[in-house]
Amino acid sequence: MADAATIAKLEEGFKKLEAATDCKSLLKKYLSKSIFDSLKAKKTGLGATLLDVIQSGVENLDSGVGIYAPDAEAYSLFAPLFDPIIEDYHKGFKQTDKHPNKDFGDVNQFVNVDPDGKFVISTRVRCGRSLEGYPFNPCLTEAQYKEMEEKVSSTLSGLEGELKGTYYPLAGMTKEVQQKLIDDHFLFKEGDRFLQAANACRYWPVGRGIYHNDNKTFLVWCNEEDHLRIISMQMGGDLGQVYRRLVSAVNDIEKRVPFSHHDRLGFLTFCPTNLGTTIRASVHIKLPKLAANREKLEEVAARYSLQVRGTRGEHTEAEGGVYDISNKRRMGLTEFQAVKEMQDGILELIKIEKEMA
């Protein structure tokens, strides 16, 4: 049972949400009085309550989603709130649906989408993973952060070949190393106000760190938003090479540390928007002609379930007609399908851009 002080805070938060008529978050849309009353006293085995789930969305009324999972059990215990939000965000992933088993598919189906190097500046594929037996950020103790970092860094130090590299802990990092990682755009900063409000940044920078290979084409973030963010990237448009590198890394790491997986939701992450495959495959791409015809760009993007962002990610402008374009769907399809849909969409965009001469 949640304690009286927590329930009082929840009641206050619920009132604030109800009064916020201009709030458009999915939390506001789906947290009815009856759902609220049925969940407000519940507590997971690790001590997480509904307050941990909704506090970021209560504090930041301009949130798009507004909820996070404090631990794996939260997805089941607070399912009456999570499930409709997941269905709404992951268009059509119904509450009766089951995410398919992991399937990276035939990795040789992926190609260089821009062999002439005229359009695609860089290509990146990332996925998120959580370590089994540990809660997500808000419930982690300082000792657990240290223990996880130890596990992750020793696991990564066993990687070989192209993936071989170095782990840099954020705690006690020298100014030189810090600057080098900033110059490479590898360093992540302490979380934004949405993550801060979700208590995702406690004991910062304890237990946080960055691993990268010598070629700087493979990167792992430890305890940023998720326990692990595994990233494969390089200049140019060779999606095949980027995808194959990611797959071999994930398979290798998985042999050494068990990941949190849910029968219905797939791989578990802190934010429900990343569930399922957890995969985001993206390119930085120059499309000057389509940039001048946003309607056409959006139409093709919608057809292939692509998300179009500005050059520097969410909420930014496209500088010089350069967009960050990625797959939108992460749930209810396999890893292979998610990346294949993105590849097909990018090939189509390049074809249209060429034809618009």
UniProtKB/Swiss-Prot annotation:
Task: Quote the temperature dependence note.
Answer: Stable at 30-44 degrees Celsius. Forms aggregates above 44 degrees Celsius.
Q: Where is the Phosphagen kinase N-terminal domain?
A: 9-91
Write out the residues that bind L-arginine.
Answer: 64-68, 225, 271, 314
Q: Which residues bind ATP?
A: 122-126, 185, 229, 280-284, 309-314
Q: What's any GO biological process attached to this entry?
A: phosphocreatine biosynthetic process
Q: Which UniProt keywords apply?
A: Allergen, ATP-binding, Glycoprotein, Kinase, Nucleotide-binding, Transferase
Q: Which GO terms describe its cellular component?
A: extracellular space
GO MF term list: arginine binding; arginine kinase activity; ATP binding; creatine kinase activity
The EC designation for this entry is: 2.7.3.3
PTM: Glycosylated.
The UniProt entry, under CDD domains, shows: arginine_kinase_like
Which segments constitute the Phosphagen kinase C-terminal domain?
119-356
pH dependence, record text: Stable at pH 4.0-8.0.
What reactions does this protein catalyze?
Answer: L-arginine + ATP = N(omega)-phospho-L-arginine + ADP + H(+)
What protein does this entry describe? Answer: Arginine kinase Pro c 2.0101
Taxonomic superkingdom: Eukaryota
Q: What tissues contain this protein?
A: Muscle (at protein level).
